[in-house]
Amino acid sequence: MKTSHRKGPLASCVRTALERYFHELDGEKPGSLYAMVISEIELPLLEAVMHHAQSNQCKAARMLGINRNTLRKKLKLHGLE
């Protein structure tokens, strides 16, 4: 089963948010941008996927393409256990 990777509304939202972030830097250099973006989107991503998977961690892990133990660690990190 091949998954299509489209550049849709999520990519557009991230791009817009980053453009706003760069504008607000006002000449300052950004630092740890990747970590910042991931930390901002990981919680709502986990919440949405767990809701869609009806709190089934195995199903959620498959949807995310990660190991169930990795998912459990991320849920614990965000207080979603």
Predicted regions and their residues:
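Bacterial C-terminal helix-turn-helix
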Residues: 2-11, 16, 23-81
